[in-house]
From Swiss-Prot:
SUPFAM superfamilies recorded: NagB/RpiA/CoA transferase-like (SSF100950)
Protein name: Methylthioribose-1-phosphate isomerase
EC number: 5.3.1.23
Pathway(s): Amino-acid biosynthesis; L-methionine biosynthesis via salvage pathway; L-methionine from S-methyl-5-thio-alpha-D-ribose 1-phosphate: step 1/6
Biological role: Catalyzes the interconversion of methylthioribose-1-phosphate (MTR-1-P) into methylthioribulose-1-phosphate (MTRu-1-P).
Record's keyword terms, sorted: Amino-acid biosynthesis, Isomerase, Methionine biosynthesis
PANTHER family: METHYLTHIORIBOSE-1-PHOSPHATE ISOMERASE (PTHR43475:SF1)
Keyword Isomerase: yes
InterPro entries linked to this entry: IF-2B-related, IF-M1Pi, IF_2B-like_C, Initiation_fac_2B_a/b/d, M1Pi_N, NagB/RpiA_transferase-like
Length: 339
């Protein structure tokens, strides 16, 4: 396979490398993903994360395994193991469905390689379309609030919600970005803050519980988030805490936008109640670990509830910005996502 580089993925000498997003921003470590077990481990540990990026990393690995001589049957088994790595992220399922089709071709090695590279290029292009469509909704002088991380670290391109902010900033329309730290794993504080700093976008980091106070003071003009899955009725699964922001935004009459690619749509999923929600380890809540080491603050026997995602009802969303354009609540009510 040709050499490939994104913010978080590399293919060099027919080997897949991932940027360890658990070590950022203090350390920039590239880790190998030589086999299915290694990549699944990286996904579970959130060293590679973001719904689009997870799908792309799995697709690239399958293509590389094929080039290294793995049989068709073994590749089919590897594909299903990868499919189970992150159940909420429908991009992974959609990408692997396309790779599964490529696997049926007579020259499956070439077909898998071509399809994986096509998926990367498509993601770059659709991120740009999302970013430009969304930036048109941003008013001059806007103070925007975002949650989790939805930029180049989570995609092959400029990103989804963070891509919108980046393009709006280039147009001179962003006065400030409020960055939720995004408990418990701090993707906002670690990753989004780092990306915005690299882009030169003015931002201020806040704890998740400060959003209500800012909205009450009129300090937030719009909220922009990404999505891991969008159901047929417009309900959105995204990083835990998104639902809270949507409720706050509705109460304070602040527009709440979701930016995501078409591949995040799941027409077969009728509503948010049907979306599987990943439950994660208690240690993520009882303490914190990073390049600085590990600290535990909760009692050893503390019981923990730690869902990775929550579901935001469509009724709380002002608009869905896809690579195909802006979808309104009226469009969704008329079955736009129902397939």
């Amino acid at each position: 396979m040709q050499t490939l580089q994104t913010t978080s993925l590399r293919v060099v000498d027919n080997k897949l490398w991932i940027l360890d997003q658990q070590a950022l921003p203090q350390q920039k470590n590239w880790l190998p993903a030589d086999n299915t077990e290694a990549l699944v481990g990286h996904i579970h540990a959130l060293r590679v994360r973001g719904a689009p990026l997870i799908g792309l990393s799995a697709s690239l690995l399958l293509a590389l395994l094929a080039e290294h001589g793995m049989t068709r049957d073994a590749l089919g088994q590897a594909l299903e193991v990868l499919r189970a790595a992150r159940p909420t992220a429908v991009n992974l399922m959609n990408n692997l469905d396309r790779m599964k089709q490529a696997l049926t071709q007579p020259d499956f090695v070439a077909a898998l390689g071509a399809e994986a590279l096509r998926l990367v290029q498509e993601d770059r292009e659709l991120c740009e379309r999302i970013a430009r469509a969304g930036s048109e909704l941003v008013k001059p002088g806007s103070r925007l609030l975002t949650h989790c991380n939805t930029g180049g670290l989570a995609t092959a391109g400029v990103g989804t919600a963070l891509g919108v902010i980046a393009r709006a900033h280039e147009a001179g329309k962003v006065a400030n970005v409020w960055v939720d730290e995004t408990r418990p794993l701090l993707q906002g504080g670690r990753l989004t803050a780092w990306e915005l700093g690299e882009l030169g976008v003015p931002y201020q980091l806040i704890t998740d519980s400060m959003a209500a106070s800012l909205m009450a003071q009129g300090q937030v003009d719009a909220v922009w988030v990404g999505a891991d899955r969008i159901a047929a009725n417009g309900d959105v699964a995204n990083k835990i805490g998104t639902y809270s922001l949507a409720v706050l935004a509705k109460f304070h009459n602040v527009p709440f936008y979701v930016a995501a690619p078409q591949t995040t749509l799941d027409p077969a999923c009728p509503n948010g109640a049907a979306i599987p929600i990943e439950q994660r380890a208690a240690a993520e809540v009882t303490g914190v670990a990073g390049s600085f080491g590990a600290v535990q603050w909760a009692p050893e026997d503390a019981r923990v509830y730690n869902p990775a995602f929550d579901v935001t009802p469509a009724a709380l969303i002002s608009g869905w910005v896809l690579d195909s354009g802006v979808v309104t609540p009226e469009d969704v009510a008329n079955g736009r996502f129902a397939g």
